[in-house]
Amino acid sequence: MKYRIISVGRIRESFYLEGVREYLKRLGPYTSIELIDGLEEKIGPRAGEKEIQAILQKEAEKIRRWLDKDEILVVLDLEGQVRSSEEMARQLEKWNASGKSRVTFLLGAAHGLANEIKQQAQETISLSRLTFPHQMAVLILAEQIYRGFKILKGEPYHR
């Protein structure tokens, strides 16, 4: 099973990027994982709802280019299901046994994701009911994927 994290927003802060890269590297012995970021369209601070929806549609077109039919799409959204680390590990195990080629985690930028992209998802999860900057959410997600694999292997890390 391969994994992919798509972050519509670019990871600009070096400390977040270094952390994400570290967890992706640590995942190497367990799975193949890649990060795609920077699909975000520019939007002015005074954009109205109509302009925001148009931007979300443009971002949706970019996202679709990265999606495959033979994958599990997992959208991260504040309204998604919150899981414990142990539950996340069990879900990783189920996805690994699904016969699909890849699991793609998708995180929107500041204005979220187009509804049509959300509706394509097989799963919608939330890291927390708290709101995080998208860069931090990518880092937390990468860490939780790593933690999940460590739990599944019964290896020390998770306490």
Swiss-Prot record:
Keywords: Cytoplasm, Methyltransferase, rRNA processing, S-adenosyl-L-methionine, Transferase. It is found in: Cytoplasm. GO terms for cellular component: cytoplasm. Its main location: cytoplasm. CDD domains: RlmH-like. It catalyses: pseudouridine(1915) in 23S rRNA + S-adenosyl-L-methionine = N(3)-methylpseudouridine(1915) in 23S rRNA + S-adenosyl-L-homocysteine + H(+). Gene3D superfamilies: 3.40.1280.10. It is an enzyme of class 2 (transferase). GO terms for molecular function: rRNA (pseudouridine-N3-)-methyltransferase activity. Its EC number is 2.1.1.177. It holds the Pfam family SPOUT_MTase. S-adenosyl-L-methionine binds at L76, G108, L127, S128, R129, L130, T131, F132. The keyword Phosphoprotein does not apply. Homodimer. Belongs to the RNA methyltransferase RlmH family. Specifically methylates the pseudouridine at position 1915 (m3Psi1915) in 23S rRNA. This is Ribosomal RNA large subunit methyltransferase H. It comes from Syntrophomonas wolfei subsp. wolfei (strain DSM 2245B / Goettingen). The gene is rlmH.
